UniProtKB/Swiss-Prot annotation:
This is Undecaprenyl-diphosphatase. Its EC number is 3.6.1.27. The chain crosses the membrane at residues 13-35, 45-65, 90-110, 116-136, 157-177, 190-210, 222-242, 252-272. Belongs to the UppP family. It is a multi-pass membrane protein. One of its GO terms (cellular component) is plasma membrane. Keywords: Antibiotic resistance, Cell inner membrane, Cell membrane, Cell shape, Cell wall biogenesis/degradation, Hydrolase, Membrane, Peptidoglycan synthesis, Transmembrane, Transmembrane helix. NCBIfam families: PRK00281.1-1, PRK00281.1-2, PRK00281.1-4, undec_PP_bacA. It catalyses: di-trans,octa-cis-undecaprenyl diphosphate + H2O = di-trans,octa-cis-undecaprenyl phosphate + phosphate + H(+). Its main location: membrane. HAMAP family: Undec_diphosphatase.
Length: 273
């Protein structure tokens, strides 16, 4: 792969990663399709995908830095603006409760989960995840019990964490699973999305660092420019995608995202079967 071509591939995949990582549409499904069409597959490609996820994570940190620092008691000038109708406040305990179920299962079944990364499993995950999004919209309480993220209870955070376990199924979408779980538990669409983004930072950071450590043998200095381009593109596009997404869900439901997932599942079938 020539230098120019590899950088172009990196830029394209960085855009795809940034666009899809935090939307409930499955970044994995998109990455395997685009990677296959670009002829970029194998161990180096897998390592590349892991590294550029760090760019997406950095976008969340930049977007929610005040809230993230506030969780650990560090305030720069003023605490994060209160979001909700009650007097509660999102705390680090909420995040830890949301992490525990997936962390435990992920560590126990890490190798088994990695073996599930194939087009068939991803296709089915896209479909089931789409059905869950529709179910969340249909079955959610008419009046959310947690209007803002600061209204969330420990129980809601833990149950959302249990739903996050579904995202261990490649192609399911971590944001899709957590947002759906939040809505079914009476958390507003917007608050569930915000909590999903905040929960993503420690979850994705931990998983990515573990994957990078296990993939270190596939890294070489010649790949640094390609990885850097992918990282930067993922960061920039994810930043735009998160801002746009949070504005969009104030006006529309998740039904269009569910339909889009079904379309992507069909695309996986066409490309790989």
């Amino acid at each position: 792969m020539s230098d120019i071509h590899s950088l172009l591939v990196a830029a394209i995949l960085g855009v795809v990663e940034g666009l899809t990582e935090f939307l409930p549409v499955s970044s994995t499904g998109h990455m395997i399709i685009v990677g296959h069409l670009l002829g970029f597959e194998g161990d180096t490609a897998n390592t590349f995908e892991v590294v550029i996820q760090l760019g997406s994570i950095l976008a969340v940190v930049v977007m929610f830095w005040r809230r993230l620092f506030g969780l650990i008691g560090i305030h720069f000038g003023r605490p994060p603006e209160h979001e909700g109708k009650g007097s509660g406040r999102l705390s680090l305990i909420h995040i830890l409760l949301g992490m525990i179920p997936a962390v435990v299962l992920g560590l126990i079944f890490h190798d088994t989960i990695k073996s599930l990364f194939n087009p068939v499993n991803v296709m089915y995950a896209l479909i089931v995840g789409g059905v869950l999004l529709i179910a969340a919209e249909v079955l959610k309480p008419k009046q959310p019990r947690a209007v803002g993220i600061d209204d969330m209870t420990y129980r809601q955070a833990f149950v959302i964490g249990c739903f996050q376990c579904l995202a261990l199924w490649p192609g399911f979408s971590r944001s899709g699973a957590t947002i759906s779980g939040g809505m079914l538990m009476g958390v507003s669409r917007y608050a569930a999305s915000e909590f999903s983004f905040l929960l993503a930072v420690p979850m994705m950071m931990g998983a990515t660092v573990l994957d990078v450590y296990k993939s270190i043998g596939f890294l070489n200095m010649g790949d640094v420019p390609m990885f850097a381009v992918g990282f930067v593109m993922a960061f920039i596009v994810a930043l735009i995608a998160i801002k746009t997404f949070l504005q969009l869900i104030k006006r529309i439901s998740f039904i269009p995202f569910a339909i889009y997932r079904f379309i992507v599942a069909a695309a996986v079938y066409v490309v790989f079967f």
